From Swiss-Prot:
Family statement: Belongs to the staphylococcal/streptococcal toxin family.
The gene coding this protein: entD
Annotated source species: Staphylococcus aureus
Record InterPro entries: Enterotoxin, Staph/Strept_toxin_CS, Staph_tox_OB, SuperAg_toxin_C, Superantigen_bac, Toxin_b-grasp_Staph/Strep, Toxin_bac
Protein name, entry field: Enterotoxin type D
Annotated phenotype, changing residue 252 to A: Complete loss of host cytokine gene expression
UniProt entry tagged with the keyword Phosphoprotein: no
Recorded GO CC terms: extracellular region
Pfam families, A to Z: Stap_Strp_tox_C, Stap_Strp_toxin
Length: 258
């Protein structure tokens, strides 16, 4: 019994010594990453306005059980007569970063959840085609029994803030990062004015979003590492059509006002 008590005491003492060192190491890593983040001031007003428009002013495209064998280029899929509720659009052209990805979904029943753009969009009905990058998942065998709410951990200047569970939801077992990111940035723009200029109440200057799945998969974006001034280039980050398992999935967001 005496040996057992000594062992417990040693384990307790060891945990006291080791734990602070681990925390400090993690804090050092986070501080380095924080310094590497891009600043809002690096972006033009046009870029910020278009990011705001893409994520907050427009609704994402949502389609279920769609199929097409049509293509414009080898790395695209063309869905003719896709839209029934948008007056200005008729066809949908989805771009991928490889022809292999397009072939994988060609003539398959799929669900789509991408953010659209129309400037410099070519391939379908002239002036009546919306373009996207990725946002595609299989329709068969990928549905949850009920919609799942994805928890968000939010830190602003290192202080954790409470976020309600209704901000990001999905009905898929495997979901594209784009579907999650579209909802998360919509929340950040509407509630925290993420892409507003300073004069319009945009206090956030730098930020990072991470999507962390139970299988160890992780995808992260620098929220102000924005390519170009227009959605045609800004949304290209989704052309890889990355997906994550929704089992034990959560989102971590780090925002800084300086």
């Amino acid at each position: 019994m005496k040996k057992f008590n000594i062992l417990i005491a040693l384990l307790f003492f060891t945990s006291l010594v080791i734990s602070p060192l681990n925390v400090k190491a993690n804090e050092n890593i986070d501080s380095v990453k924080e310094k590497e983040l891009h600043k809002k001031s690096e972006l033009s007003s046009t870029a910020l306005n278009n990011m705001k428009h893409s994520y907050a002013d427009k609704n994402p495209i949502i389609g279920e059980n769609k199929s097409t064998g049509d293509q414009f280029l080898e790395n695209t899929l063309l869905y003719k007569k896709f839209f029934t509720d948008l007056i200005n659009f008729e066809d949908l052209l989805i771009n991928f970063n490889s022809k292999e990805m397009a072939q994988h979904f060609k003539s398959k029943n799929v669900d789509v959840y991408p953010i659209r753009y129309s400037i410099n969009c070519y391939g379908g009905e002239i002036d009546r085609t919306a373009c996207t990058y990725g946002g595609v998942t299989p329709h068969e065998g990928n549905k949850l029994k009920e919609r799942k709410k994805i928890p968000i951990n939010l830190w602003i200047n290192g202080v954790q803030k409470e976020v309600s569970l209704d901000k990001v939801q999905t009905d898929k077992k495997n979901v594209t990062v784009q579907e999650l990111d579209a909802q998360a940035r919509r929340y950040l723009q509407k509630d925290l004015k993420l892409y507003n200029n300073d004069t319009l109440g945009g206090k956030i200057q730098r930020g990072k979003i991470e999507f962390d799945s139970s299988d160890g998969s992780k995808v992260s974006y620098d929220l102000f590492d924005v390519k170009g001034d227009f959605p045609e280039k800004q949304l290209r980050i989704y052309s890889d059509n990355k997906t994550l398992s929704t089992e034990h999935l959560h989102i971590d967001i780090y925002l800084y006002e300086k």
